[in-house]
Amino acid sequence: MVPAELFARVEFPDHKILAQTKDFHDSLTKPPGSLGKLEQIGCFISACQGQIPPRPLNNSKIVVFAGDHGVATKGVSAYPSSVSLQMAENITNGGAAINVIARTTGTSVRLIDTSLDHEAWGDERVSRSCGSIDVEDAMTQEQVERALKIGKRIADQEVDAGADILIPGDLGIGNTTTAAALVGTFTLAEPVVVVGRGTGIDDEAWKLKVSAIRDAMFRARDLRQDPIAIARKISSPDLAAMAAFIAQAAVRRTPVLLDGVVVTAAALLANKLAPGARRWFIAGHRSTEPAHSVALNALALDPILELGMSLGEGSGAATALPLVKIAVDLMNDMSTFSSAGVDGPLNASSEAPEQNTE
């Protein structure tokens, strides 16, 4: 399988609409540019939807991809792998941080168990955990193809159900090790540059993590132009499915609000699977994991928030979601200088450009 067999060509957000949105924003009752990044976000959503002003974002969806990682047995995490399944149950029961944030923002949460370490099976399952990427492939060819198809199918389900913005989340002990290996491989960053503390590891565990990532990157050193091979060798079923989910969202012209290092590593892979997918990304926040900044720079993304978060689950992106909604609502609900009878700036038109709702 090659990516072109799975993903259609990605069309970019409407650049003509994007150019017109600045004039639209300048017609609103405020000094030009005074809403800062909120203006940029609103303009981006307009371009994604192909209309000015953009439709309000009333159907956001958080999809958390869960899986265990064989590399977790190498001492790279402060927690045992059993926590992954326990936290998945916590999310299902509504007791995790992402559930609280989602309820506050009026967003639903869906958990996808691709590869947690238990016997259950279903349409969204790929395997029970995965290979330890420092010494063996994460998946077989059959498994990676299944993971990619699952992620693509879930994106189609959510878009077909009316989702207007998607937030992928992650869950799984050891997944920051896998994410750092992917980021290092795609960006050619050294292992020590991309390795963070994950769940709060000590110095000895950090050294083990550096070693595991170094070995994984070495195993993938000749595969940078083959994203499916990289996914098979050094990712995991949950990250591969997440990458396909992100890639297909872009194919379906649906913006993706990115979370932390694991999600952004999957976004790097998604942009390789479906070139141009990054044009549909917004970075919700910058996490404390070093690899996250490396990945954001590679995708040319400037995050909305920087709150020192590193939880995962989609929590940072979900926290940023209200600001994205505000950016859209400002374009819909603010008065223009003309409609409000307010004098605009000197030597400038106060009329908004013609709205395009096609």
From Swiss-Prot:
It catalyses: 5,6-dimethylbenzimidazole + nicotinate beta-D-ribonucleotide = alpha-ribazole 5'-phosphate + nicotinate + H(+). It comes from the Bacteria. Catalyzes the synthesis of alpha-ribazole-5'-phosphate from nicotinate mononucleotide (NAMN) and 5,6-dimethylbenzimidazole (DMB). GO terms for biological process: cobalamin biosynthetic process. The gene is cobT. This is Nicotinate-nucleotide--dimethylbenzimidazole phosphoribosyltransferase. InterPro entries: Nict_dMeBzImd_PRibTrfase (IPR003200), Nict_dMeBzImd_PRibTrfase_bact (IPR017846), Nict_dMeBzImd_PRibTrfase_N (IPR023195), Nict_dMeBzImd_PRibTrfase_sf (IPR036087). Its EC number is 2.4.2.21. Keywords: Cobalamin biosynthesis, Glycosyltransferase, Transferase. The keyword Metal-binding does not apply. The keyword Glycosyltransferase applies. Belongs to the CobT family. One of its GO terms (molecular function) is nicotinate-nucleotide-dimethylbenzimidazole phosphoribosyltransferase activity. It is an enzyme of class 2 (transferase). It comes from Corynebacterium glutamicum (strain ATCC 13032 / DSM 20300 / JCM 1318 / BCRC 11384 / CCUG 27702 / LMG 3730 / NBRC 12168 / NCIMB 10025 / NRRL B-2784 / 534). The active site is at 313 (proton acceptor).
